[in-house]
Regions:
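Short glycine-rich loop/turn motifs that provide flexible caps or phosphate-binding loops at active sites
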Residues: 76, 103-105, 145, 158
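Acetyl-CoA-dependent GNAT
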Residues: 3, 7-11, 17-99, 107-121, ...
Length: 179
């Protein structure tokens, strides 16, 4: 893998937005409506990440965390963790640059996310939502020990509603695997 995982900052907004749009345009073809992946996607993702990373979030325990995977000084993947009101931590994004998938970067980011949650939010479950038809991601999360805990409708930018699964890594399972 040879990637370094580090904390992200507002200075990563452009790189993260570019990775996010590129990942969607690769992984979501045939899954989401074409217009959701069109010309405005890059600018929409850039605005989203500039807002997310520049915002004042308040208490440290409630602050989202951006993790960046780098190779040769360039961002090649990222994960974004968001504490939720119910005490769980949402892994809101986990993306790896297309062409680098399958090389351990996603596994390293997920591992770093789980470690961050264990350190900063002891006792909290980590969960994510993934489009049901994103079979490559679904298979990855199942290989990585995620438990399918829900099937629901997900709201995608542009007003699209698509079926998604929720996968959870419980604090209890994490604690057993580290003891």
């Amino acid at each position: 893998m040879n990637a370094t995982i580090r904390r992200g900052s507002v200075h990563d907004a452009e790189a993260v937005a570019g990775l996010h749009a590129l990942s969607w345009r690769t992984a979501y073809v045939g899954i989401v409506p074409e217009q959701a992946l069109g010309d405005g996607l890059s600018e929409e993702r850039r605005a989203l990440w500039e807002l997310r990373l520049a915002a004042e979030y308040g208490e440290p325990a409630n602050t989202p965390e951006l993790l960046i995977a780098e190779q040769a000084g360039s961002a090649v993947g990222f994960a974004y963790l968001v504490p939720q009101a119910d005490g769980r931590i949402l892994l809101d994004n986990l993306h790896v640059e297309p062409g680098r998938t399958g090389g351990g970067i996603g596994r390293a980011l997920l591992g770093a996310a789980r470690s961050h949650v264990a350190r900063q939010h002891p006792g909290a479950d980590l969960y994510l939502e993934v489009l049901c038809d994103n079979t490559r991601a679904v298979a990855f999360y199942e290989r990585e020990g995620g438990l399918r805990t829900a099937e629901q409708e997900g709201f995608f930018p542009g007003g699209f509603v698509l079926p998604e699964y929720e996968y959870t890594w419980t604090a209890a399972d994490r604690d057993q695997s580290t003891s």
